[in-house]
A protein has these predicted regions:
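Transmembrane-helix signature of polytopic, membrane-embedded enzymes
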Residues: 20-21, 81, 230-233, 252-272
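Transmembrane helical bundles and short interhelical boundary loops of multi-pass, membrane-embedded
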Residues: 34-57, 357-363, 368-379, 523-560
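Transmembrane-helix motifs of polytopic, lipid-linked glycan transferases
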Residues: 67, 237-261
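Interfacial juxtamembrane loops and adjacent helix segments
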Residues: 120-236
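Membrane-interface alpha helices of multi-pass inner-membrane proteins
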Residues: 276, 307-323, 328-334
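Short acidic/glycine- and proline-prone juxtamembrane loop motifs at membrane-interface regions
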Residues: 280-287
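Perimembrane helix-loop-helix junctions
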Residues: 297-303, 326-357
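Membrane-lumen/periplasm interface segments of multi-pass, membrane-embedded glycan/lipid transferases
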Residues: 363-451
């Protein structure tokens, strides 16, 4: 072969990476233009005075960065590192797409985290915060959508007939066809202009929250933000980002520890609801990470001292963060066979030691919160005087069949909670697309775990399934006893985030069934590669939709 022909053959291989990058980035930029045009036309951004260049630049820039990240991750061969990178990058989008205080209970979590970042490790109900914190809390009430919902009777401009209106579930609303659009942007303007206003916000004091340990990552982020001269809003985002780092680190440890069904773990970690909590100031960020780590360790064929130590630490931390219900995790290592147990202690001794550590931390946290609490007085029970844990427990024991009906009715009313994976905010901001597509994505993840090398065995899978059922019923019963009025026919306060580890176990069970029904030829490596693509882009789409619903549209039009 001549030298000329050799050069011709070598040119495509040299130019291929550059050509791929150019092509992918061009496609991403084009998609960004399409999305920006869709937003401008369908949601009337031009008529609302939003800069067309700004919207287009935002969409194109975000799309190009997403494409560049996807191309860069193609070079990463390690599944755990690639998955952790997806979690971190998509989590950053969620941290900024989610407005302040809109994660459940984030106002209390923000105030407690801010206090810790100032070096306050005790609790004082009369102690306040800097003025910009007061302004931030005043501008962004929790459950913002519910707080700004309008309902009543209006007049149809075409038929002149009265028609009811209710803006529940809509962040943006407009009075009249050409009226001004009210949105959460108004809250940002209210906070950012507080120095130029004469009004004084209501003074904020420390909340009824007596935890320290799970808020330490967020407190570190807030302390770093203040070092850079940022105010209350900057501290919120700084705390979210460091909390996200903690969630990412735990997920990375889980992906490295999991020996089987890794696509299922990546899928649940990248679920929009998981990232929504992981990129917030909620202690659920580290709590979910601990759940995923413990379940990942249970996919290993054998346990050694190191495995047992990591599981015990995660279990003890989970109990210190959310006590009593998480004691169920203590018994899970007992499902391992004796031949699979290579730990210096027996399984029974290990379970007792882990339970002792969990209870010790739980009681220590409770005593710490009691002894270092000042000026709180008598703390009212959530739910009011109609809530009585002892009476409710007695009612359940006396009426077991009725309580089963309460469980089933609550599940039915809430779409089994599996259909609420797109319900954000304080359960006041639904995104229908995510609610509809999340279950099929979980099913797709189950199909990606059907390689024969991913099987967990009937015994282990059976016990994990039983644990998932007991955990779900236990979580519902705990909310019924502690938050629900005695004898009520439905359970108050349940949210789909409580069931995320149950959905992971459901995916593992579905994979076991599909493995037998479909007789697939998919390899574990191929399944993992497909999982990164599917779940990564789904998480990216979830962040974009969250931003869209809070800042772009849909817009609810009210005619009066």
């Amino acid at each position: 072969m001549s030298n000329v022909s050799k050069k011709k053959l070598s040119l495509p291989t040299v130019q291929q990476p550059a050509a791929r990058w150019a092509f992918v980035l061009a496609v991403c930029a084009s998609l960004g233009v399409v999305v920006s045009y869709y937003w401008r036309v369908f949601y009337g951004l031009d008529a609302r005075g939003v800069s067309a260049a700004g919207v287009t630049g935002l969409c194109v820039g975000l799309a190009v960065l997403a494409g560049a990240a996807a191309l860069a991750l193609r070079r990463v061969r390690d599944f755990a590192k690639k998955g952790a990178a997806c979690i971190l990058l998509c989590g950053v989008l969620f941290a900024f797409a989610n407005p302040p205080m809109q994660t459940p209970d984030e106002t209390d979590h923000y105030l407690r985290t801010y206090a810790i970042s100032m070096g306050r490790f005790d609790f004082d109900a009369q102690r306040g915060y800097p003025e910009d914190v007061d302004e931030l809390v005043a501008a962004f009430p929790g459950a913002w959508v519910n707080a700004h919902t309008s309902a009543g009777l209006g007049t149809d401009p075409d038929t002149h007939a009265e028609q009811p209106f209710n803006s529940a579930g809509y962040v943006l609303k407009q009075y009249g066809k050409d009226g001004r659009v009210e949105s959460i942007r108004d809250s940002f303007e209210q906070y950012l202009t507080w120095l130029y206003r004469d009004s004084v916000p209501q003074r904020v004091t420390e909340p009824v929250s007596f935890l320290i340990l799970p808020f330490l990552p967020g407190a570190l982020g807030m302390a770093l933000a203040r070092l850079f001269g940022l105010g209350a809003l900057g501290c919120l985002y700084g705390g979210r980002l460091v909390n996200l780092l903690a969630y990412t680190a735990l997920c990375y440890a889980a992906l490295r520890s999991a020996h089987k069904c890794r696509p299922a773990f990546l899928c649940i970690m990248l679920m929009p609801m998981s990232l929504y909590m992981g990129a917030s100031l909620s202690y659920d960020a580290t709590l979910l990470g601990c759940y995923y780590l413990m379940l990942a360790l249970l996919t290993r064929d054998e346990w050694n001292d190191k495995t047992a130590l990591f599981y015990a630490l995660a279990c003890v931390f989970a109990n210190g963060t959310k006590p009593y219900i998480n004691l169920l995790w203590v018994v899970l290592p007992l499902i391992l066979r004796k031949s699979e147990w290579k730990v210096r202690f027996s399984r029974a001794v290990y379970a007792v030691l882990t339970a002792a550590g969990a209870l010790a931390l739980t009681l220590g946290v409770e005593q710490y919160g009691t002894l270092l609490r000042h000026n709180y007085g008598a703390i009212a029970r959530q739910g009011g005087t109609t809530v009585n844990g002892g009476a409710q427990l007695l009612f359940v024991l006396k009426n077991p069949l009725r309580y089963i009906a309460v469980l089933l009715g609550t599940l039915y009313e809430n779409d089994g909670f599996l259909g609420q994976l797109g319900l954000f905010g304080w359960k006041d901001m639904p995104i229908a697309f995510i609610s509809i597509t999340a279950p099929p994505v979980l099913l797709a993840a189950a199909m990606l775990c059907t390689a024969q090398t991913d099987t967990l065995g009937r015994r282990r899978m059976g016990w994990l399934g039983a644990f998932g059922l007991v955990y779900a019923v236990g979580a519902m019963t705990a909310m019924y006893i502690t938050y629900t009025p005695v004898g009520m026919v439905r359970i108050v306060g349940l949210q789909t985030r409580y069931f995320l580890p149950v959905w992971l176990l459901l995916v593992l069970a579905a994979a076991a069934v599909l493995r037998r029904v479909l007789a697939p030829r998919l390899t574990a490596a191929k399944g993992e590669a497909l999982a990164v693509t599917l779940c990564g882009w789904y998480a990216f789409a979830g962040a974009v939709l969250l931003f869209q619903h809070y800042f772009v549209g849909p817009v609810y039009t009210i005619y009066k």
